[in-house]
């Protein structure tokens, strides 16, 4: 008799995706981040669900309801901090996952890569709307500043911003709709992630060498299930260390002050995971130019497959490209640091140079390096 996992219509899908899936024998820990993102997503949905049971999306009570969750709800504080710091973990895993894709040339799986870019944008939108919900000072002013950027769009800009706000400023209508979207989007993300996985399983995983691994496959279970469980345990350990010892390390102190439209905080800045994009936005003195640079800084990922010039897929045997890749990582860390600094000398010029470097590396230097490496290898 055939095993139930191979014959049952539902179990068959699970079996082909997580049990009998043929996987390359040499994929490293950099391939763990996909499953870690799944763990993060489930964690965020569960903690978010319990927070939504006690949260009220009204401007007069939102801040108090979050304080109530932390003070009066059983284990409310741990649920709240797991959700807030879980978002940071989510983005650490996301950036590592994207970085892995860039380094090992995983972007040549076009459908998988483009759905991944869509996922990144959706997660960023979800995180932004979630940051507005506690209705602290940074929540309010962050929402005001970021939504206001859309007013740079010619002709329809102002109407678009007022349509998103649901009025003439960020107010009750804005908070209510942001809560509604923040609640629904994770489920949409789950659906898109399933499509992401579907397309990945059409081609099979890439591996560190970037060459076909058809000659040497191993079953996903038990090898990679064990590996993924270890990764998940380490992720949860890191998260719980953050939650239990320094829960406010990555937050902004201004968010412990209730939102006040009459008092602007001295330094308006987003959460740490958006600082690199914020630095690029601020480095251009023109509003529309800044908005376009901000959008392009993320959308540039969709162009990566078109910019691949090397005859080799992975960077593992390409020292020139490796140098440029790690320069890009250093550049992104520099931008993240600059995004959190005030707009004054020398931070302005550092931010502008780092922004130019970011686009130069991706659009010019890395494709050039690929061509040079081909020439050096007489290909």
UniProtKB/Swiss-Prot annotation:
Which positions are tagged coiled coil? none
Q: For this protein, what is any one GO molecular function term? A: metal ion binding
Which of UniProt's keywords are assigned here? Electron transport, Heme, Iron, Membrane, Metal-binding, Mitochondrion, Mitochondrion inner membrane, Respiratory chain, Transmembrane, Transmembrane helix, Transport, Ubiquinone
State the similarity comment. Belongs to the cytochrome b family.
Q: Name one GO cellular component term.
A: mitochondrial inner membrane
Role description: Component of the ubiquinol-cytochrome c reductase complex (complex III or cytochrome b-c1 complex) that is part of the mitochondrial respiratory chain. The b-c1 complex mediates electron transfer from ubiquinol to cytochrome c. Contributes to the generation of a proton gradient across the mitochondrial membrane that is then used for ATP synthesis.
Which residues are involved in binding heme b b562? 83, 182
Q: What is the protein name for this chain? A: Cytochrome b
Give the way it sits in the membrane: Multi-pass membrane protein
Classification of source organism: Eukaryota, Metazoa, Chordata, Craniata, Vertebrata
The record's Gene Ontology biological-process terms are:
mitochondrial electron transport, ubiquinol to cytochrome c
Q: Which InterPro entries match?
A: Cyt_b/b6_C, Cyt_b/b6_C_sf, Cyt_b/b6_N, Cytb/b6-like_sf, Cytochrome_b, Cytochrome_b_C_euk/bac, Cytochrome_b_N_euk/bac, Di-haem_cyt_TM
- Organism of origin is Bos mutus grunniens (Wild yak)
Has UniProt tagged this entry with the keyword RNA-binding? no
């Amino acid at each position: 008799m055939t095993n139930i996992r191979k014959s049952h219509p539902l179990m068959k899908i699970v079996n082909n995706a997580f049990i009998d899936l043929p996987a390359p024998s040499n994929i490293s820990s950099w391939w763990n981040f996909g499953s870690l993102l799944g763990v993060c997503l489930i964690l965020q949905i569960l903690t978010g669900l319990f927070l939504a049971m006690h949260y009220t999306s009204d401007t007069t009570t939102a801040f108090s309801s979050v304080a109530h969750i932390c003070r009066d709800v059983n284990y409310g504080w741990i649920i709240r901090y797991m959700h807030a710091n879980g978002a940071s973990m989510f983005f650490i895993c996301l950036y590592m996952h994207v970085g892995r894709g860039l380094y090992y040339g995983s972007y040549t799986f076009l459908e998988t890569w483009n759905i991944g870019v869509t996922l990144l944008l959706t997660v960023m939108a979800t995180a932004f709307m979630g940051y507005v919900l506690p209705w602290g000072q940074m929540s309010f002013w962050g929402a005001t500043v970021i939504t206001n950027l859309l007013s740079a769009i010619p002709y329809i800009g102002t109407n678009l911003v007022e349509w998103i706000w649901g009025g003439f400023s960020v107010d009750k209508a804005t908070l209510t709709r942001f809560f509604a979207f923040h609640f629904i989007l994770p489920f949409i993300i789950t659906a898109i992630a399933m499509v992401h996985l579907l397309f990945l399983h059409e081609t099979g995983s890439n591996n560190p060498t970037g060459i076909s691994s058809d000659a040497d496959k191993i079953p996903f279970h038990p090898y990679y299930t064990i590996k993924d469980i270890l990764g998940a345990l380490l992720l949860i350990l890191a998260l719980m260390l953050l939650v239990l010892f320094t829960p406010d390390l990555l937050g902004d102190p201004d968010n412990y002050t209730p939102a006040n439209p009459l008092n602007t905080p001295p330094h308006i800045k987003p959460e740490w995971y958006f600082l690199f994009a914020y630095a690029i936005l601020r480095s251009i003195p023109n509003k529309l130019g800044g908005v376009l640079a901000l959008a392009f800084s993320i959308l540039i990922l969709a162009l990566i497959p078109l910019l691949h010039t090397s005859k080799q897929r992975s960077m593992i045997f390409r020292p020139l490209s490796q140098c440029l890749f790690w320069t890009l990582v250093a550049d992104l860390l520099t931008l993240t640091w600059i995004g959190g600094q005030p707009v004054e000398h020398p931070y302005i010029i550092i931010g502008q140079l780092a922004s130019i470097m970011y686009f130069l590396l991706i659009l010019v230097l890395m494709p050039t390096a690929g061509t040079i490496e081909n020439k050096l290898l007489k290909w």
